[in-house]
């Protein structure tokens, strides 16, 4: 039902309008591309890509922004608002917030050095948010490989390449120390660091995230090319330099079927880019609202007045 040319007649400028906002925002905020990609991911894992993550709390539901995986970390909402405002001027009541977030993710990846792909479009926006589901459906940075696979399979992403390629979104962006500290000092209650951590990387991370330090300090996922979308993430995993446990598990879980994919993507950028684009399309197609389902929100933060 979704198709890349969905807006070719009704809003042909949609891609340019979204791109111009991202280009402008990147000048002052080099993190914004990674932040937008993460918003899309956190949207799609909770009842499909329906822009439910963008809704603020109302009298009928609590916002997903308050859920543990999003609170104090999901960001970029104001940038989506900028895109929506510009699109409402150019093509009123035409482009859904769900499609804005999907297109913005693709352009964010492309502008950061990553692949391009034709984004299937025609999603509509949900009229409710799913706070409880956001707390349970999103993968945790402390997950083992088995838990990660289950979280992905639960939403319909059941190929090893879905998990390994989408994890490569951590080739840019940052995480807070509070998601890393346990690995550095007391991994799984052992009073020792995670044995998969490269010793020099461990020393670097301990400097950035001291034992009783400020958990809100931000650390780059990829120390080599922190704002570039490339395959360095996988090389880092092979060298024991994955920042969060759930990423390192892809390579360090003995006998895992994800290891050959980490090796492949590390040695071949085109293989990674192709797999990432494919997995993004698969994720973007999860349970979309189409036709007369949902609505086209006029303000991405609130449901249209009835």
Curated annotation (Swiss-Prot):
SUPFAM superfamilies: Heme-dependent peroxidases. Its cofactor is Ca(2+); heme b. The record marks 38 as: Transition state stabilizer. Ca(2+) 2 binds at residues 171, 222, 225, 230. Disulfide bonds join 11-91, 44-49, 97-300, 177-209. InterPro entries: Haem_peroxidase, Haem_peroxidase_sf, Peroxidase_pln, Peroxidases_AS, Peroxidases_heam-ligand_BS, Secretory_peroxidase. Removal of H(2)O(2), oxidation of toxic reductants, biosynthesis and degradation of lignin, suberization, auxin catabolism, response to environmental stresses such as wounding, pathogen attack and oxidative stress. These functions might be dependent on each isozyme/isoform in each plant tissue. Heme b binds at residue 170. Substrate binds at residue 139. Binds 2 calcium ions per subunit. Binds 1 heme b (iron(II)-protoporphyrin IX) group per subunit. The lineage of its organism: Eukaryota, Viridiplantae, Streptophyta, Embryophyta, Tracheophyta. The modification Pyrrolidone carboxylic acid is found at residue 1. One of its GO terms (biological process) is hydrogen peroxide catabolic process. It is an enzyme of class 1 (oxidoreductase). Keywords: Calcium, Disulfide bond, Glycoprotein, Heme, Hydrogen peroxide, Iron, Metal-binding, Oxidoreductase, Peroxidase, Pyrrolidone carboxylic acid. Ca(2+) 1 binds at residues 43, 46, 48, 50, 52. Belongs to the peroxidase family. Classical plant (class III) peroxidase subfamily. It holds the Pfam family peroxidase. It comes from the Eukaryota. Transmembrane segments: none annotated. One of its GO terms (molecular function) is lactoperoxidase activity. Glycans are attached at residues 188, 214. It catalyses: 2 a phenolic donor + H2O2 = 2 a phenolic radical donor + 2 H2O. Its EC number is 1.11.1.7. This is Peroxidase E5. The active site is at 42 (proton acceptor).
